[in-house]
Amino acid sequence: MAQIGIFVGTVYGNALLVAEEAENILKDRGHEVKVFEDATLESWLDYREQTVLVVTSTTGQGQLPDSIVPLYAALREKGGYQPALRYGVIALGDSSYPNFCAGGHLFDALLQEIGAKRLGDVLDVDAVEHPEPEVISCPWVEAWADLVDAQ
């Protein structure tokens, strides 16, 4: 089974809740999973030939939460090319604001730039439609786990 790092960017804790639910699902499927809240580039690089799941909310005018900005900046500046990396993104946001789910899409664009292979589509979770984000994220994680298993 796969080694999966879940990297979280959260402001109010919803992204962490989604990440913990994803961790449970993936562990139940036999994967080795670790959640990182204030991740460093070093912890990310441990997975550069493995699989990562980025779970992040959006804050301000479409920015990433402070907890994941240092990782994003370090990846952009020093992450290098990572063609062996497989990943997924769960983006949380509120559709009543401009730049809905932009934080997750920023991270997705960066991972595309560094050559990583996305498994499946980015999941956009709208707080307006889904005040309990795990209702939509858990089925997505199950389907994403199928893609991970197929690798």
Swiss-Prot record:
Q: In the record's cofactor note, how is the cofactor described as bound?
A: Binds 1 FMN non-covalently.
Keywords, sorted A to Z = Electron transport, Flavoprotein, FMN, Nucleotide-binding, Transport
State the source organism's domain of life: Bacteria
Gene Ontology cellular component terms for the protein in this record: cytosol
Enumerate the InterPro entries for this protein.
Flavdoxin-like, Flavodoxin/NO_synth, Flavoprotein-like_sf
Q: Name one GO molecular function term.
A: oxidoreductase activity
The family note in this entry says: Belongs to the flavodoxin family. MioC subfamily.
Chain's role: Probable electron transporter.
Subunit details: Monomer.
Name recorded for this polypeptide: Flavodoxin YqcA
* The species this protein was found in: Pectobacterium carotovorum subsp. carotovorum (Erwinia carotovora subsp. carotovora)
